[in-house]
């Protein structure tokens, strides 16, 4: 039962004190005082356990009896004051008529999980407060009637914020709510217990090796199969291997997308901020992929048991199933060659790298055909798988890019752009031929003109230096040929035949130029 008292100073806010009933201590304590009015006048009917009565008076309360509350009697534990009342309460407090005001009930909180206290009265005489096993002592004021009949009341928690926080922290519903939240959205516990559970859990991390549960009895029970059945089992096994590859591919795609999302989130929030959000999802999805992959591998193991095949420890720990499949095919081919007698003699020295190593490197090259440049970690992984050194792997990729990868790229380019390239080459050849023919024609015409000019200049007996420079100067020196130079060097003089030829030619030209009607023949 809770009673609200106002401060004598005239405070307007109402304060709440939680009063819990305790029947055992009620019978032990007795006090005597006079009362003008009882609580039965205020509350109609029987007073029940844990019933709260709110009594905010409109005026100051006059206390007629000596009701003292010592500082040692009141205890404060966890920000709350708890009092206990008996079932039948007859108040010793003289009060005036009360009116009930329920104005600020939502802001007033009751405090639980506190040390039990007692408040008892008998025969309606006295009212005392006791509290046991308290950690802190609440200083209180004394209720007395020193002529003024004033009521002193001490209040420790009068701020709504601090009262709300303390009430939430000391609430009895706090632990159950925390447990429920931990079951639903517990991130830290999952991170802490994840490593312990992952060791014993079947769904481990995706890249950890899975246990292959194939017993020797299953292998021994493999019977002779017909070629058709064996072929069918081989096809099923190849399909299952492709399914394993697809699962690996999808998981890697999911992992890369999650890493990209986490990196973009960490760019804004800071390094490592995305780990609490992504780690749980990664572990859970990894378990799903792991279970799916294990189921497929169990089917593969069953088929291998029927075929009588065995896996080595290297194949069990291998992370590239396609390379494992290629290795198995090479072993089968080698066994077939041994049966047919096509094995290379042992005395013949082996040139180059082993076929098994080359097949693994070639498989990696074709898987990364668009960018066949392995990283350092990939070189180390390939060197472990092939049994070669890191330098041998690097040299093989250098030679393979030059001898194998580049010609294939060129062939692909020719297949895609072959027709257009041929048309361009044909057009270029035609233009070159036309340029050569035009150049030859021009050279012939220039050589003939130079010869004619040389002959005309030799027939003139007396010429000045300027005229000789004009005659023997090459109008187009850039296009002078060796034929013109030889014709000039082989000239031996001026003869009579040349003179007669020149005279006849000059007469003909004079006759043509003398007739004005023949000028239109030379107009271009």
Curated annotation (Swiss-Prot):
Return the Low complexity bias intervals: 446-459
- Localization per Swiss-Prot or TrEMBL: Nucleus
What keywords tag this UniProt record?
A: DNA-binding, Homeobox, Nucleus, Transcription, Transcription regulation
Domain of life assignment = Eukaryota
Cellular component terms per the entry's GO annotation: nucleus
Note down the stretches annotated as region SR/KY domain. Answer: 171-187
Where does this protein chiefly localize?
nucleus
- According to the entry, DNA is bound by residues in 346-408
For biological process, the GO terms are: regulation of timing of transition from vegetative to reproductive phase
One of the record's GO molecular function terms: transcription cis-regulatory region binding
Record has Transcription regulation as a keyword: yes
- Pfam families in the record: Homeobox_KN (PF05920), POX (PF07526)
Keyword Cell cycle listed: no
Which segments carry the region annotation Disordered? 195-236, 429-463
Q: Which residue ranges have biased composition labelled Basic and acidic residues?
A: 195-205, 216-235, 430-445
Segments for region (BELL domain): 229-300
Similarity comment: family membership? Belongs to the TALE/BELL homeobox family.
User: What does the annotation say about its assembly with partners?
Assistant: May form heterodimeric complex with the TALE/KNOX protein STM. Interacts with OFP1, OFP2, OFP3, OFP4, OFP5 and OFP15.
Write out the function statement from the record: Transcription factor that is responsive of the nuclear import of SHOOT MERISTEMLESS (STM).
Q: What is known of its domains?
A: The SR/KY and BELL domains are responsive for the interaction between the TALE/BELL proteins and the TALE/KNOX proteins.
* Protein name, entry field: BEL1-like homeodomain protein 3
- Organism of this sequence: Arabidopsis thaliana
* Gene name, Swiss-Prot/TrEMBL: BLH3
């Amino acid at each position: 039962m809770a009673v609200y008292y106002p401060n004598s100073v005239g405070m307007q806010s109402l304060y709440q004190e939680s009063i819990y009933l305790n029947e055992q201590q009620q019978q032990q304590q007795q006090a005597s005082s006079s009362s003008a009015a009882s609580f039965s006048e205020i509350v109609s009917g029987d007073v029940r356990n844990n019933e709260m009565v709110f009594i905010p008076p409109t005026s100051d309360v006059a206390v007629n009896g000596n009701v003292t509350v010592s500082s040692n009697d009141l205890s404060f534990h966890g920000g709350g004051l708890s009092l206990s009342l008996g079932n039948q309460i007859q108040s010793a407090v003289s009060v005036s008529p009360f009116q009930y005001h329920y104005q600020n009930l939502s802001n007033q909180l009751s405090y639980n999980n506190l040390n039990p206290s007692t408040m008892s009265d008998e025969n309606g005489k006295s009212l005392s407060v006791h509290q046991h096993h308290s950690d802190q002592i609440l200083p209180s004021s004394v209720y007395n009637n020193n002529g003024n009949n004033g009521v002193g009341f001490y209040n420790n928690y009068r701020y709504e914020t601090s009262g709300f926080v303390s009430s939430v922290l000391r609430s009895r519903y706090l632990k159950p709510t925390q447990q429920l939240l931990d079951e639903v959205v517990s991130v830290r516990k999952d991170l802490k217990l994840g490593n312990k559970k992952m060791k014993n859990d079947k769904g481990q991390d995706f890249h950890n090796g899975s246990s292959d549960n194939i017993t020797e009895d299953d292998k021994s029970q493999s019977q002779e199969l017909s070629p058709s059945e064996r072929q069918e089992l081989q096809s099923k096994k190849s399909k299952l291997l492709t399914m394993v590859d697809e699962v690996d591919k999808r998981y890697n795609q999911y992992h890369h997308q999650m890493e990209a999302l986490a990196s973009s989130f960490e760019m804004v929030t800071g390094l490592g901020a995305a780990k609490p959000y992504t780690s749980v999802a990664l572990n859970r999805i990894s378990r799903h992929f792991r279970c799916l992959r294990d189921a497929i591998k169990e089917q593969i193991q069953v088929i291998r048991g029927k075929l009588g095949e065995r896996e080595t420890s290297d194949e069990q720990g291998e992370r590239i199933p396609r390379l494992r499949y290629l290795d198995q095919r090479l072993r089968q081919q080698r066994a077939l060659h041994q049966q047919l007698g096509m094995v290379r003699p042992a005395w013949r020295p082996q040139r180059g790298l082993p076929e098994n190593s080359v097949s693994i490197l070639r498989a990696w090259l074709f898987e990364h055909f668009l960018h066949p440049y392995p990283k350092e970690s990939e070189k180390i992984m390939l060197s472990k798988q092939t049994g070669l050194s890191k330098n041998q792997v690097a040299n093989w990729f250098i030679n393979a890019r030059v001898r194998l990868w580049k010609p294939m790229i060129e062939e692909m380019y020719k297949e895609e752009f072959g027709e257009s390239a041929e048309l361009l080459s044909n057009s270029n050849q035609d233009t070159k031929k036309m340029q050569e023919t035009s150049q030859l024609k021009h050279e012939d015409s220039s050589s003939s003109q130079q010869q004619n000019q040389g002959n005309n200049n030799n027939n003139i007996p007396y010429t000045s230096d300027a005229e000789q420079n004009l005659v023997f100067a090459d109008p187009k020196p850039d296009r002078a040929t060796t034929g013109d130079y030889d014709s000039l060097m082989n000239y031996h003089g001026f003869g009579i035949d040349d003179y007669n030829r020149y005279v006849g030619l000059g007469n003909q030209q004079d006759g043509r130029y003398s007739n004005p009607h023949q000028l239109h023949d030379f107009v271009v």
